[in-house]
Amino acid sequence: MHIPHFHLHKGPKGVRTISYEQLLSEDDSYASEKLSEDHVTEVHFVTDKDEDSNASGESRGSMELLENCFSLLHAQDDTSKFVSLTMLAKLLNDHPNLIFKCWERMDMKFLDRLLLSTHYEYVDLGVSILLAFCSEEAILRSYEVKKRVSTLLQCCLKHYDLCIPVICTLSSNPKSAKYLLYYTSFIINEFPFEQAFEILSNALYALDNVQTYMRPIFQGIDKRRGWKLDCTFSFFSDLFSRFPVQSWYSEAIRANLQPLMDAVVERFITDKNLSSATVILSNLLKAAGPASIMPNDGFMILVIGRCSAEIRGSLGMLVKAVGQKGKHGTVSYTVCECYEVLGLLIRYLCENCDVLAQRIEPDKFFQLQRSLTELFSDTMDFLRDAWDNNKNRDNLASHVTVISAVATLCLWLTEDDSQYAQASGLMDIFVYLWRHSWSNGIDYAKWISVALPSMLSNKVFFKAFKDFDAWKVVYDDFIKCNDDLKGDKSFNDYILSTNEEDGEDERLAQAIQDFHILIQLNSLVPQSIWNDDIWQEPYWKNLLESNF
């Protein structure tokens, strides 16, 4: 560990002391350069002499030097304190193991005075000292560092660039990050927004849950009318990308969401770039639901139209890019967020279709449906073209744009039977992605199997499904889910041990979905599969008997 020399220098002879008032005064002309040369020479004489001693003598010498150092540090005059810091820097460079002893005996009041000084040299010295000691995690999490945070933030208001390395160091540990976040209200209300957001982002990212700190942040932005600023959007876009909804949202801030939503509405109306707005909107929708967030049906129609246009305008350039890492990453990210928003709104539309059909004018409702139909027609063309133009299918299947496109497309296909014939042209892709999900943890099986029962009612789609022997992937998935569920126990033992309060296991839900698809495909599947041992499990045996 390297301890900096604290920026002290030799100066002319002649020393005077300095009071606390002088140290903080605007008129203070006492600079670190005015340290006595005699004092500095004495320090070097002592340290040089110590370096020439043997191992035991070196230890004794360093301890003697340490005692001399702290005698000067706690002296009444400030000149002695400055000299002691020169000694301390030299001592810690030679003996870094003494850092904890030095921190325990540090003159904290003097350190605070340095941080609050009106002279840059003193502030620089104080920040350097604090940063050097905070390089040790145990010191970083100490009570004395916690007590310095208020002073550091006051210093940071005047010397932001000087203090930000210490802020970043504090933010590197969850405990010390909380020391900073204790002052969330002060930070968001007193600092320029860009600086406040940088401090808060650094500190928040050290934690797993940030609910506690969201309300004062919302209130501070509201108080200072900062909702429309680009830095505000960047802050929330980054925050929501980093944390899942449950990590930042609580009912306590529901009432504070409206100003942010109003700013999002304005962005959708006026801005060409929807990147930040879609990230924020998707998270607000997941947190509070469309009914609470959407100001009116007109805005919902606007959002669907703009997101659809954003996606359709970008898919062409992404056909080849999805097979090349890093290419058009920003565009892919925006497209994914647009799909995310559309998925949430499609669910809302499906769940409230009758009510919305009565509320929304027929021509606008038709316009909304046409917009989505055209989008997903283009989405299927994109998937077909991307598949045919990229040989590395595993990379393609793992690309965020493909994942988002398939997830939202399958949701839409559960409702729109007019596009089943076109969807039949993706049968090879669906089968591949379903199998791909087994080893890569992507929910393709879940998404495709939800849409499949509806699509199988279409003759064109059913024929394509039959031609690809796609029933095999459904049955293989059913067996795999059962194997995963059983582990070392029998399947029935697993079912009996499942706690209903914990909710249904996703693998069990998938197995049940596969079962119902197999029943629907009874005319396609070989009848011999119904004789497999899996159907002797009481759970499936009962289901099978009730369906035949």
From Swiss-Prot:
Record-listed Phosphothreonine modification sites: T47
Modification type Phosphoserine: residues: S19, S25
Annotated Gene Ontology cellular component terms: cell division site; mitotic spindle pole body; nucleus
InterPro entries given in the database record: ARM-type_fold, Neurochondrin
The entry's keywords: Phosphoprotein
Residue ranges the record marks as coiled coil: none
Listed name of the protein: Uncharacterized protein C16C4.02c
Species, as recorded: Schizosaccharomyces pombe (strain 972 / ATCC 24843)
Lineage: Eukaryota, Fungi, Dikarya, Ascomycota, Taphrinomycotina
